[in-house]
C-alpha cells in the first residue's frame, strides 16, 4: 500500500535525531537521510510510534542544528504558520497559511488524535514537512494533505513528541502507558454508521473473518456510530484480548470475535 520506495522530509530535533511522519519509514528495510549540506547520514535506528504517527530517526555522522520546539497550546485559529519541504534533495520549498483549528481527528487506519493542527497551508512537496509558527518555532509535522475534503493539510502537534520523547530516544516504552488493541482493518464513517472498507492481510481481523462491507454496529456491546466511538471502545482492550464486533453482513446480524494484536509487533 505504501510502496517499495518512499521519499519524505523531516526536521532535526536533536543534533543526531530527525523527526518525520512514521509511514515514510514503516516496514522499511533501510532508511537513508540526506541533510541540507548534501551529505548523507547513516540511520542507526528508526523509532516508530504508531499512536502519534511520528518516527524519530537516530543518525550517525556530523551533528545537525536542531529546531527549537513550541507546544501548540498557544496556537489559536487564524495564527500564521509555514512549512518547509522539497521534492528532491537538491531543492527547498516553503508555503504559508493559517491555522484553521486545533481539534480532534480520526483516520481509517486505526488512528485518532485528540488535538491535530488543521491548516490552510498547501504542501508543495513531500510529506513529513516541519510546520513552524511565525517565530520560527516547530509546532508540528505535516502528515496529510486533505484538500479533497476541504482542508489543505494536517499536522501532528509537537506536543505529542514532547510527551513521548524519552521513550522514542531510549527505545523503552513507559510502563505507565497501556497497550492498545489493534485488529488491522480500515473502517470508514458515513451517515449510516461505520463500515469495514478493507483489511490488513494476515492481520487479526482478517484471520477472524471480518469482511469488507461489514457494517459495524457495536464493540463488546457498546454501540458505535463514528470512528471516535469505534476506537474509544476498541482501545479499552489490549493485545491478546478478545474483541466482539457485532456486524450487519448483507441481511444478517452476527458477532465476530477477534483476538487483538499489537501493531508494533506486526510491523517489525
Summary of predicted features, one role per range:
Residues 46-53, 102-117, 172-180, 186-193:
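Gly/Ser-enriched beta-turn/beta-hairpin loop segments
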Residues 9-11, 70-74, 130, 204-215, ...:
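A short glycine-leucine-enriched loop at secondary-structure breakpoints
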Residues 83, 134, 138-191, 242, ...:
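C-terminal cap/linker of serine protease catalytic domains
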Residues 18-21, 74-87, 127-148, 167, ...:
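Active-site-proximal beta-strands of protease catalytic cores
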Residues 67-114, 147-153, 165-178:
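Flexible, gly/ser-rich surface segments that form the specificity/activation loops bordering the active-site cleft
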Residues 3-8, 12-93, 115-116, 125, ...:
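Conserved active-site neighborhood of the chymotrypsin/trypsin-like protease fold
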Residues 14-22, 139, 205-227:
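Conserved PDZ fold ligand-binding element
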Residues 42, 169-173, 177, 195, ...:
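PDZ-domain C-terminal substructure recognizer with occasional recognition of PDZ-binding tails
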Amino acid at each position: 500500500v505504501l510502496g517499495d520506495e518512499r521519499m519524505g522530509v523531516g526536521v532535526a530535533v536533536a543534533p543526531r535525531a530527525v523527526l518525520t511522519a512514521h509511514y515514510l519509514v514503516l516496514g522499511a528495510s533501510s532508511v537513508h537521510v540526506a541533510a541540507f549540506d548534501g551529505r548523507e547520514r547513516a540511520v542507526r535506528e528508526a523509532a516508530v510510534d504508531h499512536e502519534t504517527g511520528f518516527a524519530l530517526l537516530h543518525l550517525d555522522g556530523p551533528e545537525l542544528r536542531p529546531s527549537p520546539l513550541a507546544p501548540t497550546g498557544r496556537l489559536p485559529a487564524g495564527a500564521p504558520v509555514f512549512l518547509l519541504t522539497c521534492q528532491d534533495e537538491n531543492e527547498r520549498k516553503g508555503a504559508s497559511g493559517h491555522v484553521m483549528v486545533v481539534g480532534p481527528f480520526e483516520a481509517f487506519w486505526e488512528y485518532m488524535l485528540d488535538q491535530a493542527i488543521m491548516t490552510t497551508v498547501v504542501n508543495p512537496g513531500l510529506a513529513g514537512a516541519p510546520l513552524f509558527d511565525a517565530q520560527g518555532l516547530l509546532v508540528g509535522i505535516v502528515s496529510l494533505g486533505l484538500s479533497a475534503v476541504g482542508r489543505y493539510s494536517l499536522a501532528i502537534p509537537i506536543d505529542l513528541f514532547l510527551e513521548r520523547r524519552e521513550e522514542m530516544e531510549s527505545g523503552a516504552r513507559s510502563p505507565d502507558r497501556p497497550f492498545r488493541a489493534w485488529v488491522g482493518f480500515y473502517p470508514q464513517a458515513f451517515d449510516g454508521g461505520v463500515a469495514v472498507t478493507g483489511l490488513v492481510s494476515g492481520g487479526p481481523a482478517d484471520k477472524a473473518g471480518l469482511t469488507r462491507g461489514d457494517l459495524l454496529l457495536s464493540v463488546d456491546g457498546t454501540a458505535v456510530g463514528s470512528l471516535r466511538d469505534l476506537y474509544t471502545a476498541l482501545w479499552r482492550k489490549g493485545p491478546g484480548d478478545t474483541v466482539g464486533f457485532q456486524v450487519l453482513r448483507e441481511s444478517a446480524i452476527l458477532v465476530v470475535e477477534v483476538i487483538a494484536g499489537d501493531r508494533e509487533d506486526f510491523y517489525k
